Amino acid sequence: MKIGFWPRLSAIASLGILMLLSFNLQPVVAQVPNIPDTDRPLDAPPLLEPPEDLLDRTNPALPSNEIDSPDETLVFTVNCYLIEGSTVFSQAALAEVVAPFTGEVTYAEVLAARSAINQLYLDNGYLTTGAYIPEQTLADNTVVIEVVEGEVTEIEVTGLQRLNPGYVSSRIALATEKPLNVPQLQEALQLLQLDPLIATINADLAQGTQPGENILRLEVREADSFNAQVDLSNDRAISIGTFRRGISVTEGNLWGLGDRATLSYNNTDGSNVVDVSYRVPLSPRNTTLELRYLNGLNRIITEPFEELDIKSRSQYWEFNLRQPIVQTLNQELSLGLIFSHQAIETSILGVPFPLSDSADINGRTKVSALRFVQEWVYRSPQDAIALRSQFSWGVDWWDATINETTPDSRFWSWRGQFQYLRLLAPDTTIIFRSTVQRSDRALMGLEQLSAGGLGSIRGYPQDFLSSDNALTTTLEARLPIFRNSQHLLQIAPFFDWGTFSNNGDNPNPSPQNLASVGLGLAWQGGENLFARLDWGIPLVDANIERDRTWQSQGLYFTVGISF
């Protein structure tokens, strides 16, 4: 029996669909504070609205079966269906879908088998894929159903000024592999919308010249990639002056590659630090390489040591390769490999002099290390969780310090960080964060974990003590007391605690435990102004020298403006 089931092109469901994917994403406003980390701060991305609320998409209706066909009352035998062209589903899965339409069937039931294949693709998000029944002669009572899987053959990007169009198209292309899955494409567009270089994306998916072919047109508006910030804080050690003045300038798209360059300068009465970094994307999967260089000069300004002109010069180099493994709208898992090298030289009255057991006779200390980093961030409209793990192996590269008995560049340590945020009500949050460090031997001061002051245990001076092993925790609530469209004022009661110990011949710090309670006052003025004042009350006596600095009284402040 010969049957003519030639479809018109318009009868292939979704082979020529036109859909608008226009949207303007607005992240949920929930500020996730950074986990304190002197090596590599962890910034949690903004929380997102549920994906189904972010994208307005209209699905076209399935076409009617108005094709030239035999008498629909004609009955014939179909033992099986041969589905050709499908790369998504197994033959067993397809056979199960069309099984109800075997045996003694009518032409209408054969069309229903084709529609069942179409529906299977639609239900799984393959909206531009269609099935049809070609003209054929029934052999062995087998009906052939052809599947034309949809694909994007061209991505057109318009509207960009400085950003390379390939930055956008290469990332979206990862979600347009054949067969095209529209929900996956939507999620890729939403993820790209979160990129700080992108302000808005309008997407249009249109029919190509051949069945199954589609053209994706993207109209992109760039975000402002330049940022500058000035801030003041008393977050430095008393010995070099607590009052810090800082300025930083960042260009997030320096050469149009999505490459980020940052230059910052900070100083106190006894210190000057210049920090330069450059990060460039290496692949559409957001592989990045970051290079960082830091140069600092510190001078002791507290009595009676000021007269001795005690100075330290430091240089720090870092090479950071980072690769996200999982990226979705509500979580990210990434791995990183870091090589760092730090060199410090100390002197008294201009003469090189060792100020630690690890330094050589010329006061030089050098540490080289390989670090393996794992980061995981999860966020929802109500919660955010951030985890960071870092394994560090000290190596004797780049003329690193090697000693017989005292701590040197050969070591192993692990540092873990955890942060949890819960949004209880608008602008009302509770935050818990913790940092732990363990090492296999006595460490040089450069690798120890410091505690005290902002970002650690408030109520004690900044960097009050350091140790090889440590555990610190903070519990803080943020409660609004005044807010309007431009300003938000919050109080922040907190509790900080930590315990510390050393390895080998390094004596344990005294005291080994620190704890404090206190109250913070945080103000946010629009998007550019911020200020915070914290007052910490130490619960463990630590023989703190009470001088005229705010820090020695347990008071800490930060004021800043960005533009």
Regions found by a protein language model. Give the residues of each.
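Transmembrane beta-strand segments of outer-membrane beta-barrel domains in Gram-negative
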Residues: 288-441
